């Protein structure tokens, strides 16, 4: 007979491992209990659960890998709420830095260059890195000095102390590029 649900049951048990064990779900026979006043003692699991029930709180397994496992007498609902709140705050504080690319050709007009420069500044103010790329086609490859000149003029304009040149002007194949990044704010 083939058990078709075995994979689903296995997945359910894995997701349950992320939750902390509380009260009768704690498997150890003896646990180190941390009381509300900070005192500790090693007790059989039944006595520890009884102590938690006496003060109308939960026995929560904090460190299951310790010998004996460490449990704390706390209100599990409040504890879980504070953990989720802390994780939400950490996610909010994380900033994902994206790499934005601004492309141009070596025969770019001054007005177009001004427009591209405004885009570059906007991306940098948002906190993104900017890759400025110049594509050369055909005979333009003989005049790479024009590309270096354009990149230098952009760097002079950006020259603010809030931005840093992460990668100097390089030539790869038919493209020339440099990367400008905002300084990290710590």
From Swiss-Prot:
Protein biosynthesis found in the keyword field: yes
Keywords: Cytoplasm, Initiation factor, Protein biosynthesis
Subcellular location: Cytoplasm
CC annotations in GO: cytosol; membrane
Gene3D superfamilies on file: Translation initiation factor 3 (IF-3), C-terminal domain, Translation initiation factor 3 (IF-3), N-terminal domain
NCBIfam families listed in its UniProt record: infC
Record function comment: IF-3 binds to the 30S ribosomal subunit and shifts the equilibrium between 70S ribosomes and their 50S and 30S subunits in favor of the free subunits, thus enhancing the availability of 30S subunits on which protein synthesis initiation begins.
Protein name listed in UniProt: Translation initiation factor IF-3
Species, as recorded: Borrelia duttonii (strain Ly)
Gene for this chain: infC
């Amino acid at each position: 007979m083939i058990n078709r649900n075995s994979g689903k049951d296995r997945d359910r048990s894995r997701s349950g491992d992320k939750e902390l064990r509380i009260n009768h779900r704690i498997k150890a026979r003896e646990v180190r209990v941390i009381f509300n006043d900070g005192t500790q003692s090693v007790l059989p699991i039944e006595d520890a659960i009884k102590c938690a029930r006496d003060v109308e709180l939960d026995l929560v397994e904090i460190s299951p890998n310790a010998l004996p496992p460490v449990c704390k007498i706390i209100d599990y609902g409040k504890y879980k709420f504070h953990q989720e709140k802390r994780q939400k705050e950490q996610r909010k504080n994380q900033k994902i830095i994206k790499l934005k690319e601004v492309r141009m050709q070596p025969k770019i007009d001054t007005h177009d260059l001004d427009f591209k420069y405004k885009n570059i500044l906007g991306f940098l103010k948002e906190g993104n890195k900017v890759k400025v790329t110049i594509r050369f086609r055909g005979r333009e490859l003989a005049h790479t000095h024009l590309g270096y000149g354009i990149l230098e003029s952009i760097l002079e304009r950006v020259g603010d102390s809030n931005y840093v040149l992460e990668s100097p002007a390089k030539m790869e194949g038919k493209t020339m590029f440099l990367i400008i990044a905002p300084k990290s704010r710590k």
